[in-house]
């Protein structure tokens, strides 16, 4: 909402719209400018022109799929992160494994993945968290109607004896840049 609730109605009347910036120092080509601008400008238009009570991010994501087809038809070099698999996960204390969860913003899409293999022909359909008990590399991609829509996303998971363990430093570390008690684990 371009009119924050923290402002009074008197203050809100001075807001006449929204603004999207694209800093051009590192934009060397028109293709890269398009990549940086789309579909971000579509999201900006959604924020500006859709009434607050009608805003629905899931509906926007469904409509964005058709907008990509329109951008392709027009030859616009749009960013395809919408079609990338995202990695998440957490340690499962019950099974002593790290469970990787995959998701995508794209509705009605299928995620396919492979462990320790970038060969797309060996990808399996993702349906449940992936249990890892050792260091593993994972590749994943998003498919719509059997067609890969974005790039292949890759992540290395360093699962080892220390993963998921509670640990302390003894004696307590004294260096100033230590972040929340994290330090090198020996073993």
Predicted regions and their residues:
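Flexible, acidic glycine-rich loops studded with aromatic residues
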Residues: 1-99
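Short, compositionally stereotyped local motifs that mark structural "simplifiers"
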Residues: 55-186
């Amino acid at each position: 909402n371009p009119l924050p609730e923290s402002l009074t109605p008197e203050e809100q009347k001075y807001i006449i719209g929204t603004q999207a910036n694209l800093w051009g120092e590192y934009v060397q080509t028109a293709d890269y400018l398009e990549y940086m601008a789309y579909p971000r400008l579509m999201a900006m238009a959604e924020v500006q022109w859709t009434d607050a009570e009608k805003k629905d991010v899931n509906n926007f994501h469904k409509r964005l799929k058709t907008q990509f087809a329109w951008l392709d038809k027009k030859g616009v070099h749009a960013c395809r992160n919408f079609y990338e698999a995202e990695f998440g996960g957490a340690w499962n204390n019950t099974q002593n494994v790290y469970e990787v969860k995959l998701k995508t913003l794209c509705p009605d899409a299928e995620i396919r993945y492979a462990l320790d293999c970038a060969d797309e022909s060996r990808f399996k359909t993702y349906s449940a968290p992936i249990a890892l008990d050792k260091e593993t590399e994972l590749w994943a991609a998003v498919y719509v109607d059997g067609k890969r829509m974005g790039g292949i996303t890759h992540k290395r998971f360093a699962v080892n004896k220390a993963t998921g363990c509670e640990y302390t430093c003894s004696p307590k570390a004294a260096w100033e840049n230590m972040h929340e008690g994290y330090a090198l684990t020996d073993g």
